[in-house]
């Protein structure tokens, strides 16, 4: 059980909807599993944090997958989450790292690239899917998710994401916020929000200082205005299994399975999301072949 969690809140009498997350241990779990280097850890961690909060907006068994592909050296960042605070992620090239940028920060933009898109696919149940995409406008990811909400979901939002990495590659702090303007919000409220966000300390610094998700929202929106609705735990969770990969092998067809038996005397599958390995004996593959006959 991690100490990570997300809070859902309203502010300014329901004119603003807000989410904030602490994801340090969740991102650490992903870093450990994928051996990511610092710049890759920051890019993956920011994406995981955003995806976890987007998952918190879902209901029941709904889930979503986010693919960030800016055509940069890191390749794709793929994360998925559900409404229960479970999130997982991987990157194509985990050993991606660059010198710090001019601001002295991890150069996430250089790793992610700026010539691609963010794609979001929501599985809302009953074989019903919603998908949206928007171009990457910054590569720093916070601005890119902000732009995604404005263009794909027509929801004016501000997304702040931060990950700090220790010299030994472990995660020092990770978290973020999504603040959304609801239909009918007063201009005065929007102006206050814009001013507060433009003047705030970077989110990773606030988390490093020990600010909780509640504290983050109080810092941005003002303690008097925030009404916390719910607090839910967040953790790295992968739903892969021996059986799921066996089904995937089944989908490869008879010829491919016969080849595995003849040449490899079995099979091994590795989960992209968590790195777990699953081994399949000749005997298991023969049983699988018989079921296809």
Curated annotation (Swiss-Prot):
One of its GO terms (biological process) is protein refolding. One of its GO terms (cellular component) is cytoplasm. Keywords: Chaperone, Cytoplasm, Disulfide bond, Redox-active center, Stress response, Zinc. One of its GO terms (molecular function) is protein folding chaperone. It comes from the Bacteria. Under oxidizing conditions two disulfide bonds are formed involving the reactive cysteines. Under reducing conditions zinc is bound to the reactive cysteines and the protein is inactive. InterPro entries: Heat_shock_Hsp33, Heat_shock_Hsp33_C, Heat_shock_Hsp33_N. Pfam families: HSP33. It is found in: Cytoplasm. Disulfide bonds join 238-240, 271-274. HAMAP family: HslO. Belongs to the HSP33 family. Redox regulated molecular chaperone. Protects both thermally unfolding and oxidatively damaged proteins from irreversible aggregation. Plays an important role in the bacterial defense system toward oxidative stress. This is 33 kDa chaperonin. It comes from Staphylococcus aureus (strain USA300 / TCH1516). The lineage of its organism: Bacteria, Bacillati, Bacillota, Bacilli, Bacillales.
């Amino acid at each position: 059980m991690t100490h990570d969690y997300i809070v859902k809140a309203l502010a300014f009498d329901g004119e603003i909807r807000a989410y904030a997350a602490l994801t340090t241990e969740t991102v650490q779990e992903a870093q450990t599993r994928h051996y990511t280097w610092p710049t890759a850890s920051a890019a993956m961690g920011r994406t995981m944090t955003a995806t976890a909060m987007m998952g918190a907006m879902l209901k029941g068994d709904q889930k979503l997958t986010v693919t960030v592909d800016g055509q940069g050296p890191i390749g794709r960042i793929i994360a998925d989450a559900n409404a229960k605070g479970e999130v997982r992620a991987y990157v194509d090239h985990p050993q991606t790292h660059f010198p710090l940028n001019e601001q002295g920060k991890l150069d996430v933009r250089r790793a992610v690239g700026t010539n691609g898109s963010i794609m979001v696919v929501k599985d809302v149940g009953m074989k019903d899917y919603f998908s949206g995409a928007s171009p990457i406008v910054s590569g720093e990811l916070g601005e890119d998710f902000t732009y995604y909400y404005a263009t794909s979901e027509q929801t004016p939002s501000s997304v702040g994401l931060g990950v700090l990495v220790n010299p030994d590659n472990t995660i020092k702090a990770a978290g973020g916020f999504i603040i959304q303007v609801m239909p009918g919000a007063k201009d005065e409220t929007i102006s206050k929000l814009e001013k507060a966000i433009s003047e705030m300390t970077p989110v990773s610094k606030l988390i490093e200082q020990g600010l909780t998700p509640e504290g983050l929202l109080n810092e941005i929106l003002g303690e008097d205005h925030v009404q916390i609705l719910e607090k839910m735990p967040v953790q790295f969770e992968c739903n892969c299994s021996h059986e799921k990969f066996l089904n995937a092998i089944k989908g490869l067809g008879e010829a491919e399975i016969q080849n595995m038996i003849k040449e490899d005397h079995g099979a091994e599958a590795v989960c992209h999301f968590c790195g777990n390995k699953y081994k399949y004996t000749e005997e298991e593959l023969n049983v699988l072949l018989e079921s296809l006959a």
